[in-house]
Amino acid sequence: MDNRNMINRVFSQKILHQIAIKNKSDVVDEAYDFYIQGPKNINVIQKMKSLYNYLKKSYRNEYFYKNTILNKLLLGRHSINTTTALSEMPIGKSIADFILLNGKGVVYEIKTELDKLDRLDNQINDYYEVFNYVVVITNDKHLNKVMARYKDTTVGILVLTTRNTLSEVQKPKENNSLLNTKAMYNFLRKEERKRVIAQNHMDVPTYNDFTEYDVLFDVFKKIPMTKLHNNMISELKKRGNMKEYKDEFLAAPAEIKFLLYFAKMPKVWG
């Protein structure tokens, strides 16, 4: 197995589920023995914390970036009481790495030291069809290229520094010029679309399972864009259900908070 692939597998939902069921993981053990070669008599979460420290110092992969964003932005600047996070959400032909929703929706596109920038323009354009704030999170390696493309635009730029802090290079600005009703409709789940329509007291013609998508969209697209976008953000915020596990989640190790948040399994470490 490729050594990098080994450590990438450690920080995954599949491994988290294994730990929840068995309280151990052969993948974690193998990676720990390879990278850390430390004491054997520690539990699986302690091994994951040691492996995360390796990521911090030697291999800042996408998981490290995502977990840093969750800890420093969702938990550091905001609150799980008022803010909802989404991850790996398809928008057009792109996948949004991380989205924060409070009074507004902000898409965070991650470009690690390991990534290329080839698709970045297309990704940003896709995101602006659904959300009006977009931020690129990158590093010193890519900063000059990112700045050359997006300086003095509406795109925000954050840098994950060598000290593993987030430094704001350019503040994001609201951009409504590319918002697209069809893209927003497709981003929402079926019941969310229906609630948005109901909130606006729109008359809905009779439909069946075969005509539902088109009939509801014909109604949906008549809602004024500003109202529509605000309603969409409100609906998306409801997807967060970590509040019932708040105390347990906040007490969990910082190294695995991203996995726990999106797995909705905050008692894995117990």
Predicted regions and their residues:
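Nuclease catalytic cores
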Residues: 21, 58, 62, 221-225, ...
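Catalytic cores of nucleic-acid endonucleases
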Residues: 114-161
